[in-house]
Amino acid sequence: MNILLLSAGGPTAHGAIKSLRDINFDGKIVSIDSNPLSAGFYLSDSYHIVPKAFEDGYIEEIWKIINKENIDLILPTSSNDIVTISKNSHLFEGKLFMSDY
């Protein structure tokens, strides 16, 4: 299973990556953030720099990453991601780990 963590620079993403590593997660951890110096990038197997969640092109970039990295599960970790992704949840059916908008 390949997991995509959104907003890799925040404490929630950092904690999620650390927890996955602690249990010897047998999959790929991919992270995204708009900040090229995001701390989560250094803990992930791969990473991508994307627009901010409320900017144009954000959803399209996520889909490019989903296809390129064979993502099975998306884990939004910031309030901006949660709002944007939940408003577009119909585009990600079966891949989201979050409640409905």
Could you tell me what each predicted segment is?
Residues M1-L4:
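Extreme N-terminal starter segment of soluble prokaryotic enzymes
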Residues L6-A8:
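Conserved N-terminal Rossmann-fold NAD(P)-binding element of oxidoreductases
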Residues G10-N24, I66-N67, S86-S89:
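Surface-exposed amphipathic alpha-helices with a cationic face
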Residues K28-V30:
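Conserved beta-strand positions in the Rossmann-like core of class I SAM-dependent methyltransferases
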Residues I32-S38:
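Short, polar loop motifs at secondary-structure junctions
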Residues Y42-S44, L91-F92:
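Short, structured coil segments at secondary-structure junctions
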Residues S46-I65:
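Glycine-rich, highly charged phosphate/nucleotide-binding loops
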Residues I71-Y101:
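A short, GP-enriched loop/loop-strand-helix hinge that lies immediately N-terminal to
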